[in-house]
Amino acid sequence: MPRSQKNDNFIDKTFTVVADIILKVLPTTVREKAAFSYYRDGMSAQAEGEYAEALQNYYEAMRLEIDPYDRSYILYNIGLIHTSNGEHGKALEYYYQAIERNPSLPQALNNIAVIYHYRGEQAIEEGNIATSEILFNQAASYWKQAIRLAPNSYIEAQNWLKITGRIEDNINL
């Protein structure tokens, strides 16, 4: 039984019902409907922390989905799972693929920045200040891109950029 048919969560059930109605109303192919079903089941599994199941669904959705924009969200969610699992290198690969297909995906840019910032912090702990500066500058670059796309988001990143002297104000993003 598909995950979408066994949800006990009210919000997930509501989303599933609305998504099913939209799929019936909009002119979509069987392939597109199947891709969306796998994507939806992947999101549901991911929300419950069932990452292996979520990845299986996302990979199947990727196999079926041909639209680059839709694929960007699948890739982004795969990146989220790898981030949650501490697999930052893999996560970066998926985030890069997501923004390659959809350059207007600020959350992927933000997550790339977060990983570079984390690696910068690790470099400091290891006593490698030069490497930390390179990593922090990479984080700053990605945060600036994310903030340009979503100026009212990523307030902590904006503050970090100001505090560290990487921007003087929002105009210089």
From Swiss-Prot:
GO terms for cellular component: chloroplast thylakoid membrane. The keyword Thylakoid applies. Keywords: Chloroplast, Membrane, Photosynthesis, Plastid, Repeat, Thylakoid, TPR repeat. It is a peripheral membrane protein. Disulfide bonds: none annotated. One of its GO terms (biological process) is photosynthesis. TPR repeats lie at residues 35-68, 72-105, 120-153. HAMAP family: Ycf3 (MF_00439). It is found in: Plastid, Chloroplast thylakoid membrane. Pfam families: TPR_1 (PF00515). This is Photosystem I assembly protein Ycf3.
